Amino acid sequence: MAKNKFSKDWIHQHINDPYVKLAQQKGYRARAAFKLLEILDAEKLMRRGDIVVDLGSAPGSWSQVARERLAGPGGAVDGRIIALDLLPMEPVAGVEFIQGDFREEAVLEQLARMVEGQPVDLVISDMAPNLSGVGVADSARIQHVCELALEFACAHLKPNGALIVKAFHGSGFSQIVQSYKQRFKRVVERKPKASRDKSSETFLVARDLK
């Protein structure tokens, strides 16, 4: 009964969520688009000519935002957008997509080859591991995903590049922040308005490699 009540509550909340309705109106595939938009506006990030890598891209709302931000006068992408996800993603015009597991070395190598010789301006990561409900195990998974995004960004970003990554408050969060501060000159936390109040998610914005 409790599970059914939870499901009904979630459905009710989802249907009445203003960001869900706004996403439908604007053609975004998910309400998460508004999280990224708020962060980009606050940080004045992503502009024409940028090379952007979108990690954990499915269903594609962040890639859609990048596509809009990088659109030139004729509508074509002015820059480059490379997206990656374990799940399939419906094509977004002008976005190059890799389907694969970011934790696998072969997939990382494929992504690295695609950006070889082209330093990246911005890495955006909405990746989240499958959570088990076991605190210690989940914290380790979250930390691992954040560390993978960090290592990729440090290897491929321009010196003045930036990384936006989803994390979760809880055990291990302070270690994630500390590891980011060791590699970047500026690291801030942002909780966009589109993030649900009950969610422990937060976004780290790391800028300027040390």
Swiss-Prot record:
Enzyme Commission numbers on file: 2.1.1.166
GO terms for MF: rRNA (uridine-2'-O-)-methyltransferase activity
Top-tier EC class: transferase
Residues holding S-adenosyl-L-methionine: G60, W62, D85, D101, D126
Extent of Basic and acidic residues compositional bias: 191-200
InterPro entries: RNA_methyltr_RlmE, RNA_MeTrfase_FtsJ_dom, rRNA-MeTfrase_E, SAM-dependent_MTases_sf
Residue span of region Disordered: 191-210
Family annotation (HAMAP family): RNA_methyltr_E
Protein name stated in the entry: Ribosomal RNA large subunit methyltransferase E
Native source species: Bordetella parapertussis (strain 12822 / ATCC BAA-587 / NCTC 13253)
Name of the gene this protein is made from: rlmE
